[in-house]
Amino acid sequence: MFQQIAYNPKILSGKPYIRGTRLSVEFVLELFASGATRDEVLKTYPQLTTESVEEALKYAAQSVKNDVLLDVKVKS
């Protein structure tokens, strides 16, 4: 299902990562959360491809579909 995402307990403490790199899916998500654009991410990390970034986002979306979600309180 996910050709670009790999998992190995001996790499990055078992976090899912982009195959052929040592960049975790979590790290890629944090880049976007901090405001980076896709073009900025691809320019800064040339080992990533458009396909690998898209797959990381899809992997994350699939992961939270089946996860327990925590309550988030919003301050007004």
Where are these regions (language model features)?
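Short, Lys/Arg-enriched N-terminal segment that forms or immediately precedes the first helix
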Residues: 2-17
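Short hydrophobic/aromatic patches at helix-to-coil boundaries
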Residues: 3, 73-76
